[in-house]
């Protein structure tokens, strides 16, 4: 297909941690003249989000098996076979030069279909420990990439593509220069909130008083309850919101962030150059722990496992950090970021298209 417009099929779905990095790479390649389509599922966030970015999307029918009953397990081979056949038809119609797998259930059937159609697969693992689908697809992928070291033994570490407005933030030494007053604590619960953060931070605010000021994003439906908790703690002066539309502005405001350690969050915190207290979601694979570990090892963050995340432990930690310490941690966070992750992933897609 030399001389013709190059075509990319992005496979990603389910969560923002899969979809947003895929969109970053898609836009980068579209700016270079590539044509991009998306493979997803009709009942997850990509169905509405991807078309908003001017990218056409095709759907296959597939869902996860974890936590499903015996009947779902028994019928899984049939459903996977049907999903692969659906994806094969889409691949034959679109004829992509390369398929980029960014994670989610759709990547399994989609990646196998691409391989059966002779289309090279570039795989990107966002988390510090590889998911089951990507571990399986790595055997047939043309190139395997990872955001954090350790997910695959021999894969290139390229980081996670993050939003350009976060990458454009001033370096910590510039952003934090001359700051005085209470330490600014940004609390990010995610779109669904994090109950442990919502329960604990009002008590931390009461413990530390005027030493800190908080901007607390509580998640969908949690605003009345958490606002009341701050009021009952005598801490009604903090900013408590359901969502934050401009995360770059929030990062720019903050001196330190308290949050879960999803792959994209960790990558954004590093790119912004922010110290962090990470509270990994308790999952049997411990993905979020492994995501946060490189920043803790770099001296840029502390990990507090959920059972140990108490008002006492958090208050003690925050009280031990002065502005000089926070600046040092911020600079270490920025030093381990990979700000050109989008370009690195895109370059591997281009390379795979040339060797196809």
Curated annotation (Swiss-Prot):
CDD domains in alphabetical order: GT28_MurG
Predominant location: membrane
Pfam families named in the record: Glyco_tran_28_C, Glyco_transf_28
E.C. number(s) listed in UniProt: 2.4.1.227
Catalytic activity as recorded in UniProt: di-trans,octa-cis-undecaprenyl diphospho-N-acetyl-alpha-D-muramoyl-L-alanyl-D-glutamyl-meso-2,6-diaminopimeloyl-D-alanyl-D-alanine + UDP-N-acetyl-alpha-D-glucosamine = di-trans,octa-cis-undecaprenyl diphospho-[N-acetyl-alpha-D-glucosaminyl-(1->4)]-N-acetyl-alpha-D-muramoyl-L-alanyl-D-glutamyl-meso-2,6-diaminopimeloyl-D-alanyl-D-alanine + UDP + H(+)
Highest rank taxon of the organism: Bacteria
Pathway this chain belongs to: Cell wall biogenesis; peptidoglycan biosynthesis
Family designation: Belongs to the glycosyltransferase 28 family. MurG subfamily.
Single GO biological process annotation from the record: regulation of cell shape
Encoding gene (name): murG
Gene Ontology CC terms: plasma membrane
Name of the protein this chain belongs to: UDP-N-acetylglucosamine--N-acetylmuramyl-(pentapeptide) pyrophosphoryl-undecaprenol N-acetylglucosamine transferase
Species the sequence originates in: Yersinia pestis
Role: Cell wall formation. Catalyzes the transfer of a GlcNAc subunit on undecaprenyl-pyrophosphoryl-MurNAc-pentapeptide (lipid intermediate I) to form undecaprenyl-pyrophosphoryl-MurNAc-(pentapeptide)GlcNAc (lipid intermediate II).
Chain residues that bind UDP-N-acetyl-alpha-D-glucosamine: 15-17, 127, 163, 191, 244, 263-268, 288
Compartments where located: Cell inner membrane
HAMAP family in the record: MurG
Taxonomic path: Bacteria, Pseudomonadati, Pseudomonadota, Gammaproteobacteria, Enterobacterales
Key words of the record: Cell cycle, Cell division, Cell inner membrane, Cell membrane, Cell shape, Cell wall biogenesis/degradation, Glycosyltransferase, Membrane, Peptidoglycan synthesis, Transferase
A GO molecular-function descriptor: undecaprenyldiphospho-muramoylpentapeptide beta-N-acetylglucosaminyltransferase activity
EC top class named in words: transferase
Signal sequence interval, chain numbering: none
Bilayer topology term: Peripheral membrane protein
